[in-house]
Design a protein with these regions (language model features):
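Aromatic-lined carbohydrate-binding/catalytic grooves of carbohydrate-active enzymes
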Residues: 324-461, 474
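Small-molecule kinase domains that catalyze NTP-dependent phosphoryl transfer to phosphate-bearing small molecules
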Residues: 906-946
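Active-site neighborhood of glycoside hydrolase catalytic domains
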Residues: 389-393, 425-582, 592-597, 601
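Carbohydrate-binding surface patches
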Residues: 241, 634-677
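ATP-dependent NMP and nucleoside kinases share a basic, alpha-helical "lid"
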Residues: 856-904
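C-terminal beta-strand-rich structural cap/linker in extracellular carbohydrate-active enzymes
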Residues: 693-722
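Conserved nucleotide-sensing/catalytic segment adjacent to the nucleotide-binding pocket
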Residues: 784, 793-850
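Polysaccharide-binding surfaces and accessory modules of carbohydrate-active proteins
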Residues: 5, 10-13, 17, 21, ...
Length: 946
């Protein structure tokens, strides 16, 4: 069980896979916090210490005991008016103006499954994935009951917290402050990491040492805001990406919030997260219940990367509900930076035609399609289609776009209204305003009062009337201002619940519409929004260099699959910076990927590059979105921004690097990878170079010398699973051979084996042989790779000429009698070398052949201590070859062989009819030789003995 209650000590223990959270009901009935950190099974009540500290109050129930004080004890949910003078989680005012609530334990319940919150987004899980602990605390005199909710997701290493506040008295009360979670630590040397920003530059990481006093941040803007994200990390001073302890709190809420970190008089630490108490004063009548939104907590003993992975898993698996969360999503192009307000229906159709030709999946018609909306001064609230502007109905436009083979998306901003709109003229009171005062404008618009159901219903009906006109595939929901005219203490909270109600109705009615959140970019990028929309436009800033910072900060809590990221035009519309299309593409691939530009203005070369970009993204999309994301550098500190995605099986990895700064004669920069298997062998797709996982993680890969500023690179690594499977199979076949033991005079020949790797040209013989050699070396078995390309009688060019001569003189039968026989191959030579190796000879003269006339040599090679000789060669299964112990055949077809030969570009005549026929004849012989193989590597990657 994830939740355990010790009735003797009244200790609650919450266990996840790697963490433990513990609290205790003490003898006076107070709920004290004991421990949160790395997993252990000990009762941690010994951490509580008691001392007589001046000016620290003592509860009356403690009698004359001056060592007992809530001002110094670690509490689970501290309240105002109890003698605790630190920051508190709850402040309630009664109808007489008194602010004092003393919460004592009443009861608890442990149940399977994860609690849900009425009207609020929250982590969800099945009954076998989570458990819930509900602890009831109360103050009978104040008439208040507080239900502390804990959700334990064991596999995710996540604990969620929420609070229900009930008015159990007969009069009214007012909630002045309500936080969802408090974490009290009996020690106090921490750093606080927060994510600050501004419009078009969100979620910059800032790390601050927590000194005495309070460090606080939050939002009073009505949204979670561009300025501070509702997320915090409390870290040990020496914590890095890969080591050290750190705690995370993430608020599942899209409105005003507050986070407070305090180091008190005796160096203890308190961390609070919840609703902002500014512009908040919530009345609660007798019998009513108030719900505090949820906080997701997690702890990592292994640095920030592990903490991020825990949050990424929780959000992607237990917050995002959309069916699109784990599906391939469309590559889209948005009309905004292509046309802004200046477009017609034909403009959108032309954009769709261009998109289809580039391989883009969807066109999104952004702001300007409704009412009389030709600028940002009018028509918000009037959600009817401007058919004059579009040149027809929306249904007709959607059909025209779909006819181009692309999907159709549309932009909305339901929460806003312009004063120049029919809606405002009919219902001016529906806009949020302080009675008797003129409202604060922003972007020439006001906010509709979504706390009122009749307002929501009107807009919902308008929006549905639009959506029902045709098959809309995608909706971008925007929100382009902050809330200023807060006329009541309950408004900000009720407004957010109204937005959630609207979104719930929308996604329920249109489950097949992909919904993307937006608030001037990343002004409402939070877990609350992700409950309804699986992705959010990360920032209005599409500059590739700025985006490395924005996406870096975002990644600490939110998975890549949630980050809307697009390639935009240059000079960039926000910064004026010019970066290459390649750099813009690589940066946007660290998100949902799309385009914000006018393709009609692109050159043919740029269009072709975009086609290749899209192919690349689609090749790696599931790896990027479903893989484990690793930050390799910090764009705030390093000269490059580097990140990577590793598949869950660790068999594939994609590394992306952007040079942020360059200088003359710079030192070579090495990027160290993460998350790979140390002993596995990986091949880099573009170069064919092989590495062990340990080498990539410990030594890294060098960037090309003289990398230019803003230049970008991608490296794709594939684990050579066939080689590992082959190695394991060979070990079985080898039986009792002691290959990793030193030779004796009698054993040198007995313990030597020859393995041949053979198959069609380009079938991967060289790759598998090199990887197989590495696996032997990993096992302390010395191994040598011999290439059969050294053993024809003639260099490659002359051999091709001889093949053609034979064909011209003797036809196909003569060519068949030449290929792979002693007429073409010096079998005597290679058999001699293999025989000497098997006999235990240490110095063997090995033949080497180049590609130019006369480029043939014989070099003495030291085989001392070498136990395994791997021969990689097309003819490694030939009847003329002697001394092979384990022949291994790589299956391939002539078509595959031809395609590989052409792709590798080593032979300029690879596609000629004659060479293709040679390949077919060789394959005929290989198919026969394959029957003699001891081990076969199938085209499906399976390895089996025959």
């Amino acid at each position: 069980m994830a939740i355990i209650f010790n009735p003797n000590k009244k200790i609650f223990t919450l266990q996840t896979a790697h963490t433990t959270y513990q609290m205790q009901v003490d003898r006076l009935g107070y709920l004290l916090h004991l421990y949160y950190g790395a997993k252990n099974t000990c009762d941690m009540d010994y951490v509580l210490t008691y001392a007589d500290r001046g000016f620290s109050g003592n509860p009356y129930a403690a009698g004359m005991n001056r060592t007992y004080s809530l001002d110094t004890l670690p509490q689970e949910y501290p309240t105002l008016g109890t003698g605790d003078f630190r920051n508190i989680a709850l402040d309630i005012k009664n109808e007489h103006g008194t602010e004092s609530v003393e919460l004592l334990y009443k009861s608890h319940e442990i149940r399977d499954g994860k609690y849900a919150l009425k009207g609020l987004p929250a982590v969800w899980a099945s009954d076998d994935e989570a458990q819930t602990l509900e602890i009831v605390l109360g103050d009978d005199i104040a008439g208040v009951e507080v239900h502390l909710l804990y959700g334990v997701l064991e596999a995710c290493d996540v604990i969620t917290r929420s609070v229900l506040i009930k008015n159990t008295g007969s009069g009214n009360i007012t909630i002045e402050k309500a936080h969802a979670a408090c974490l009290d630590m009996v020690y106090g040397d921490y750093d606080v990491i927060r994510f600050y920003g501004k419009h078009a530059m969100e979620r910059n990481l800032e790390r601050t040492h927590l000194g005495h006093g309070t460090l606080s941040f939050g939002s009073r803007r009505g949204t979670s805001s561009h300025q501070y994200n509702p997320a915090v990390i409390l870290a040990q001073r020496d914590t890095t990406e890969n080591a050290g302890g750190c705690y995370g709190m993430l608020f599942v809420y899209s409105g005003n919030f507050s986070c407070e970190a305090e180091k008190d008089q005796i160096n203890q630490t308190r961390l609070l997260m919840g609703l902002s108490d500014e512009l908040f004063s919530y009345p609660l009548a007798a019998g009513e219940t108030f719900t505090v939104p949820e906080v997701i907590m997690s702890y990592s003993a292994d640095g920030f990367s592990q903490l991020s992975h825990q949050y990424h898993t929780c959000i992607s698996e237990h917050v995002c509900r959309s069916r699109f969360a784990h599906e391939v999503r469309p590559v889209l192009i948005n009309s905004w930076e292509a046309a802004y307000f200046d477009f017609t229906g034909d403009t959108i159709v032309d954009l769709a035609k261009e998109a289809a030709s580039l391989g883009i999946d969807m066109v999104v018609m952004d702001d300007g399609w409704f009412g009389k909306r030709d600028d940002d001064n009018s028509s918000l609230g009037d959600w009817f289609v401007n058919e004059k502007k579009l040149g027809g109905t929306l249904s007709e436009l959607i059909d025209r776009v779909h006819a181009q083979g692309v999907k159709f998306g549309i932009w909305i901003e339901p929460e806003m209204v312009n004063e120049d709109s029919n809606l405002y003229r009919e219902h001016p009171d529906w806009a949020i305003q302080i009675p008797g005062k003129l409202p604060v404008r922003s972007r020439n618009q006001l906010i509709l009062d979504f706390s009122r159901k009749e307002v929501r219903d009107n807009i919902f009906d308008q929006i549905c009337a639009v959506f029902d006109q045709g098959k809309i595939d995608y909706v971008k929901w925007d929100m382009n201002r902050s809330m200023a005219d807060v006329y009541a203490g309950n408004l900000a909270y009720d407004y957010v619940l109204g937005v959630y109600d609207f979104m719930e109705r929308l996604v329920t009615r249109y489950p097949d519409i992909l919904l993307e959140g937006c608030s001037g970019g990343g002004g409402r990028f939070d877990a609350g929004m992700l409950y309804y929309s699986p992705q959010i436009w990360c920032s209005d800033n599409t500059d590739a260099i700025n985006r490395t910072r924005i996406q870096y900060g975002t990644s600490f809590f939110y998975p890549v699959s949630t980050m809307g990221a697009h390639v935009s035009a240059v000079p960039n519309h926000q910064t004026g910076r010019v970066t290459s299309l390649k750099t813009r593409g690589i940066t946007a691939m660290a998100g949902t990927f799309g385009y914000e530009l006018n393709p009609a203005l692109l050159s043919d070369e740029e269009k072709e590059e975009i086609r290749e970009q899209i192919k690349t993204f689609k090749k790696y999309e599931m790896l990027i979105n479903e893989g484990t994301y690793w930050r390799l550098t910090s764009p705030f500190e390093d000269e490059v921004a580097a990140w990577m995605s590793v598949s869950r099986a660790k068999d594939r990895a994609l590394v992306s690097v952007v040079r942020l700064y360059a200088e003359a004669n710079a030192a070579t920069y090495y990027v160290k990878l993460k998350g790979l298997e140390s002993d596995a062998v990986y091949i880099e797709e573009n170069t064919g170079r092989q590495y062990t996982g340990a080498a990539l993680m410990n030594a890294g890969i060098p960037l090309p010398f003289a990398t230019k500023e803003y230049e970008a690179y991608q490296f794709s690594f594939i684990r050579l699973d066939e080689a590992k499977k082959l190695y394991d199979e060979i070990k079985k076949v080898c039986g009792n051979l002691k290959l990793n033991e030193a030779d004796t005079a009698d054993s040198a020949s007995d313990n030597r084996i020859v393995i041949s790797i053979y198959g069609g040209s380009g079938s991967g013989k060289t790759t598998i042989a090199a990887a197989l050699q590495q696996y032997f070396l990993n096992d302390n078995t010395a191994c040598y790779v011999l290439t059969g390309d050294n053993y024809p009688h003639r260099i490659p060019m002359r051999n091709d000429e001889e093949r053609l001569n034979v064909y011209n003189e003797s036809g196909e039968d003569g060519l068949r009698g030449y290929l792979g026989t002693p007429k073409e191959i010096d079998f005597d030579r290679i058999n001699k070398e293999l025989s000497e190796f098997k006999a235990g000879k240490d110095i063997i003269e090995i033949k080497h052949m180049g590609r130019e006339d006369g480029d043939i040599s014989y070099d003495e090679t030291d085989f001392t201590g070498i136990k395994v000789l791997i021969l990689e060669w097309t003819h490694g299964g030939s009847e003329y070859l002697k001394g092979v112990d384990i022949p291994v055949f790589l299956e391939s077809s002539p078509e595959e062989t031809k395609a590989r030969r052409i792709k590798r570009g080593r032979d300029e005549n690879a596609a000629s009819p004659f060479i293709c026929r040679v390949v077919e004849l060789e394959q005929e012989k290989l198919d026969l030789q394959g029957k003699n193989a001891r081990i076969v590597v199938g085209k499906d990657g399976k390895v089996y003995e025959q």
